[in-house]
A protein has these predicted regions:
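Conserved catalytic-core motifs of GNAT/GCN5-like acyltransferases
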Residues: 119-120, 132-153
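Short glycine/proline-centered loop/turn elements that form peptide/ligand docking sites
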Residues: 97, 101, 123-127, 144-149
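Acetyl-CoA-dependent GNAT
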Residues: 2-90, 101-103, 107, 159-163
């Protein structure tokens, strides 16, 4: 599905009722994006939404307000960690992951973030290319980190002071 404009939302809210619905919506979007590899439960997402150190950046289709993409980060002091990024299958291959991460990195650079770290499966070439395009550098690996298929984890890092 082609998208020309998406609404960005920082997924923090003070209303507990909204947090629960947002957790359900985020879980449904993650499940749709990662139907075979979903390690985040709705309860874990709900807890993250209530955690002051966790930040969700949401992309919604303005036509139907459906969550079509999201990125989940943790910010502690000046260190940012990307836990998850997901784009629904029908919305992929349009540069939305790049746009979503670019917005989030700009936010963190303006809000005391100095360095971003993430982990990705070594076989996930599309994600690795995305991170490298956004100036992330590989700094380490964890051999056989993922128990199901013994894939390696690749650790990337980016200094937010650097320009893309």
């Amino acid at each position: 599905m082609q998208i020309d404009h998406l609404d960005y939302q920082w997924a923090k809210t003070q209303d507990p009722k909204d947090v629960g619905k947002m957790a359900t919506d985020i879980h449904a979007s993650l499940h749709q994006a990662f139907s075979t590899d979903l390690s985040w439960s709705a309860n874990a997402i709900d807890a993250s939404l209530n955690n002051p150190y966790h930040h969700f950046f949401i992309m919604r289709d303005p036509a139907n307000l459906e969550i079509v993409g999201l990125a989940h980060f943790q910010l502690i002091f000046d260190e940012v960690e990307l836990f998850n990024i997901a784009i629904l299958p029908d919305y992929r291959r349009q540069g939305l992951s790049y746009r979503l991460l670019e917005e989030a990195l700009l936010y963190f650079a303006q809000n005391k973030g100095k360095i971003v770290t993430l982990e990705v499966r070594s076989r996930n070439q599309a994600a690795r290319q995305l991170y490298e395009k956004l100036a992330f550098k590989q700094i380490a690996s964890r051999p056989n980190y993922y128990p199901v298929d013994l894939d390696d984890a690749i650790i990337y890092q980016r200094n937010l002071v650097d320009k893309i």
